[in-house]
Structures are given as structure tokens and as C-alpha cells.
UniProtKB/Swiss-Prot annotation:
EC number: 6.3.5.2
Pathway(s) served: Purine metabolism; GMP biosynthesis; GMP from XMP (L-Gln route): step 1/1
Protein name in the entry: GMP synthase [glutamine-hydrolyzing]
PANTHER family named among the record's database cross-references: GMP SYNTHASE [GLUTAMINE-HYDROLYZING], GMP SYNTHASE-RELATED
Single GO term (MF): ATP binding
Superkingdom of source: Bacteria
Length: 539
């Protein structure tokens, strides 16, 4: 991925201006989920690779450290090791699963295979109600285990605070050094008191206040935006989704009428969406300026003959930026006679934390796919980027949007990718295929809304397998139509997702309507893949 060089005026990261819990990722499947759970406790948190040198971690002056799980055995050669310096720095530490075992291993405890593995829901045999992590909790708890090794002897100075049949030392603590650990995964919903355990560590063990709130985020971000943009002007790409709407609202609060929002109609939106966006913008940003740009022919021409998904994302990202550069020139030209006009220097984008992670923006992170507003930017971009949501998860963005007073229809709008239907057509993007997919998508959205499932699912991409034809029977003859794929998922932040269990009667209505009302489609299939291993979007 091409990384754009930071500008000298780029504001300091949030971790530099507020107490931050760093989650050290030892290869956990759900390291991002740990960070989310910490933020749910109103404490700011970020994820860093466990391979980060201890000195570099401590330079950031973390308020606390949480050590994630991981697939390795601490005693095997080449396994990730915990630097004892992190345990000697006086920073509160909580180890989870592998992180728990790494604490024991580093401080002289014993980690071994006991012959009893624990996977899934497990009942704690004993809990010390006087311990920091379990104070004022039910003594009977069900937790989510996933381990073959176990701590059989705690390090010197540690009190054992919980145990199970397969883990004689399932939790321990050293109050004096403020080091704690549990063998299970409190971050997952299957651990009945998991969030309470994390909150006990954060608020009691580490002594952190609950200061990470939507109102606090707004105040901090508005100040940072003013610091970054100064007296210059900005334009914001408005898509109609919650991300760009909240980003625009934050920037508008910071710089007022020096922000112009631009909506690029690239022809890849869903049925009736452009008109909805114009109306919603008026409700959310009354009096603000919105420039509508019709670039449908330009995008469709650029995508002609292109089938590779990464190539499509790159093309859409580049055309998007070029369209903005033209809009910038027009805005500047209009204000030439205004003596108070200043340079239009910044491009506001609704980039989120998961976008950055999936695009390889984190140190040591693998590039899963290029997001059009992160890794899809051209090298010679003429703007400086302002990304006020870059450190937020989706649920936090919604909370900020609600706090800002945005319409509910925007705040709770289901996610829709920037490249639009262009990455939901598997194959070349043509006008005929877009029209076909729009109709199928409209049917799905209408039926899910009628069934009251809007808030129960995260999103439901409808995918057209444009390069595939299947044999069908309609009336008295054979048909050779395209399949469409329904991809309903449940999620909290898009980092992980499960396929949504849509009621059979709803699926039946959707299938019947699509195959009867959409010419060229004769088969509807359901994608039942979780994330991981599959991403939410097919491309």
C-alpha cells in the first residue's frame, strides 16, 4: 500500500492526548475486539503488534497494557515472548489466554500441557470474590476457553483467583505490581461476566476513569481539526453513509462555512440513493453547501473491460480523487473575487479504524484489501487528508453522530462501500448489469425493512455473479440467467462478522420476488460464511 507522507500540521494521534490502553497482539483472532471492549468501558485503546520493542511501547506512556491471546505455546522455540521489561515498568498489565501464560512464563511460573484441553464454554470451579477482577460478582461463572496448555504454577508473589478442571491456575493477580491475568477470553460474549472483568481491571486494577465518551470525542476532534486545517478550506466527499456524514458534521463544527461538501454520483449507487442523499443532507446540514457532481459516464468508461477487483477499487479511488480535484478547481474559481477566500487544501474522508487495519495501515499488519479511501489513493494526490474518524470503530461513529444531532436515518444507515455496486458485480461493470443489480438490491432492502430486520443485521450486500450463468426453468422453457448472492451479516464493528440467520419466510419472499421481477436472474443463493475467513464484501 502506498502510504501518504504525514503533513507537519497533522494533529497528534489520540493516544498522545489522552490515557491509552495498548493491546499487544500476539496473533489473536480478535485483538481488535479487545480494543472495542475497552472502549465500551469508556477508556481509549489501540492495538499494537506484540513484536513492538518494549522501549517503543513504554515511550508512548500507556495507561495500561493488555496482552492478547495467540495460537503459539510459550515454551516452544520461536514463540512470541513477552519482554520482562514491560512487567517491571510499573504499568498495569492484564494477560488474556496466551498473554496470561506469557506472564507466568516470563516471571518463573510453570506452563505445561496438562492433558486436558478446554475449548468453548467452561464453568469456573472456584472464584476469589475478594480479588480485584472478580469483586462483587457471582461465584459461578461460565467463561470461553480456547487452550491446550495451562498454567500449573503461578509465579512467586501471585495469588490464584480462579481455577477450572483443565486449568488449575485459571486466573491470578499480584496487586502490589498491578499485574493480572485470566486463561479465558473475557472479550467474547460467551464469557458471562467478561465485560465486568475487563472493567474491574481498567477502573479498579489500573485506576482509569471512564473518560472516553461521544461528547469528549467531539470536543477533542473539533480542536484537532481546527489545529490541522487552520484558516484553510476543505471539501468533503459525501456518500450518504454515516461515516462521511459524521466526518462532515465534525469538520463543519470546527471550520463552519469553509467546508464545502461534494457528492460524486459515480453511477454505482443503489436505486434512488442519490436523491435520498440530497434530501438527507439538507436535513442534517441545513444551510450548508452541497455540490452535486454527475460523473456516471466517466466512471463507467474507466471501468470498461475491467474485471480484477483490486483494479476496480484502484480505478474508482483514482477517479474519485480526480473528480474532487475538478470540484476543488471550480470552488476556487467561484471564490476568486472573494477577498476573504483562502486556499482549498484539505480533503475530508470518513476513514475508520477497521479501514486502516484492513489496508495494512497498522505496523506489521497484512494488507487484506485496499479500501478506496485508504489504500486506493493515487500517489500524486493534490490534497492533504483530514480523517477525523480514523481512530474510531463504526459503533463509536454512530454514537458521535447521534450526539451531533444527525437524523436517525443517517446514523443507523447500513454500511455501503465507497466503490458501491462496482465491487458487488463479479465481472465487468456495465450499465445493464448495474440496472439488474439495483433492482435485486432494492427488493432485498424492501423485504428486510418490512420484516423489521434493519437494526438486527449489520448489512446485506447483494452480489451479482455477472460472469456466471446457470440453467433454470421458467414457464415452459429453459433459462440461462445470472445468480445473485445474498450476504446478510451480523457484526459490531466489521472487524469480525457472522452470517445472519434470516427467517425462512423472508428468504422465500426475497427469492420469489427477485426471480419473478428481475429479468436475467434465475437463481438466488445465500452466503453462510463468517468473517474470518471471508470478508463481508466479495471484492
Amino acid at each position: 500500500m502506498t502510504q501518504n507522507a504525514p503533513h507537519p500540521d497533522t494533529p497528534a494521534p489520540l493516544s498522545d492526548v489522552m490515557p491509552t490502553v495498548l493491546v499487544l497482539d500476539f496473533g489473536a483472532q480478535y485483538a481488535q475486539l479487545i480494543a472495542r471492549r475497552v472502549r465500551e468501558a469508556n477508556v481509549y485503546s489501540e492495538v499494537v503488534p506484540a513484536s513492538t520493542p518494549a522501549a517503543q511501547i513504554l515511550e508512548r506512556e500507556p495507561a495500561a497494557l493488555i496482552l492478547s491471546g495467540g495460537p503459539s505455546s510459550v515454551y516452544e522455540p520461536g514463540a512470541p515472548q513477552l519482554d520482562p521489561a514491560l512487567l517491571e515498568a510499573g504499568v498495569p498489565v492484564l494477560g488474556l489466554c496466551y498473554g496470561f501464560q506469557s506472564i507466568a512464563h516470563a516471571l518463573g511460573g510453570t506452563v505445561a500441557q496438562t492433558g486436558t484441553r478446554e475449548y468453548g464454554s467452561t464453568r469456573l470451579d472456584s472464584v476469589d470474590a475478594d480479588s480485584v477482577l472478580f469483586a462483587d460478582q457471582d461465584l459461578e461463572q461460565v467463561v470461553w476457553m480456547s487452550h491446550g496448555d495451562a498454567v500449573t504454577q503461578a509465579p512467586e508473589g501471585f495469588a490464584v483467583t480462579a481455577s477450572t478442571a483443565g486449568a488449575p491456575v485459571a486466573a491470578f493477580e499480584d496487586r502490589e505490581r498491578r499485574i493480572y491475568g485470566v486463561q479465558w477470553h473475557p472479550e467474547v460474549g460467551h464469557s458471562s461476566r467478561g465485560q465486568r472483568v475487563l472493567e474491574q481491571f481498567l477502573h479498579e486494577g489500573a485506576g482509569l476513569g471512564a473518560d472516553w465518551t461521544a461528547s469528549g470525542v467531539i470536543e477533542e476532534q473539533v480542536e484537532r481539526i481546527r489545529e490541522q486545517i487552520g484558516d484553510k478550506r476543505a471539501i468533503c466527499g459525501l456518500s450518504g453513509g454515516v461515516d462521511s456524514a459524521v466526518a462532515a458534521a465534525l469538520v463543519q463544527r470546527a471550520i463552519g462555512d469553509r467546508l464545502t461538501c461534494v457528492y460524486v454520483d459515480h453511477g454505482l449507487m443503489r436505486e434512488g440513493e442519490s436523491a435520498e442523499i440530497e434530501q438527507a443532507f439538507g436535513e442534517a446540514h441545513g444551510g450548508a453547501r452541497l455540490v452535486m457532481v454527475d460523473a456516471r459516464e466517466d466512471f463507467l468508461s474507466a471501468l470498461a473491460g475491467v474485471t480484477d477487483p483490486e483494479a476496480k477499487r484502484k480505478i474508482i479511488g483514482e477517479r474519485f480523487i480526480r473528480t474532487f480535484e475538478k470540484a476543488q478547481a471550480d470552488i476556487v474559481l467561484e471564490s476568486e473575487h472573494d477577498p476573504d477566500a483562502t486556499e482549498v487544501r484539505f480533503l475530508v474522508q470518513g476513514t475508520l479504524y477497521p479501514d486502516v487495519v484492513e489496508s495494512g495501515g497498522g505496523d506489521g499488519a497484512a494488507n487484506i484489501k485496499s479500501h478506496h479511501n485508504v489504500g486506493g489513493l493515487p500517489d500524486d494526490i493534490e490534497f492533504e487528508l483530514c480523517e477525523p474518524l480514523r481512530e474510531l470503530f463504526k459503533d463509536e461513529v454512530r454514537a458521535v453522530g447521534a450526539e451531533l444531532g444527525l437524523p436517525e436515518g443517517i446514523v443507523h444507515r447500513q454500511p455501503f462501500p465507497g466503490p458501491g455496486l462496482g465491487i458487488r458485480i463479479i465481472g465487468e461493470v456495465t450499465q445493464e448489469r448495474l440496472d439488474l443489480l439495483r433492482r435485486a438490491d432494492a427488493i432485498v432492502r424492501a423485504e428486510l425493512t418490512a420484516a423489521g430486520l434493519d437494526r438486527q443485521i449489520w448489512q446485506c450486500p447483494v452480489v451479482l455473479l455477472a460472469d456466471v450463468r446457470s440453467v433454470g426453468v421458467q414457464g415452459d422453457g429453459r433459462t440461462y440467467g445470472h445468480p445473485v448472492v445474498l450476504r446478510p451479516v451480523t457484526s459490531e464493528d466489521a472487524m469480525t462478522a457472522d452470517w445472519a440467520r434470516i427467517p425462512d419466510d423472508v428468504l422465500s419472499r426475497i427469492s420469489n420476488r427477485i426471480t419473478n421481477e428481475v429479468d436475467g436472474v434465475n437463481r438466488v443463493v445465500l452466503d453462510v460464511t463468517s468473517k474470518p475467513p471471508g470478508t463481508i464484501e466479495w471484492e
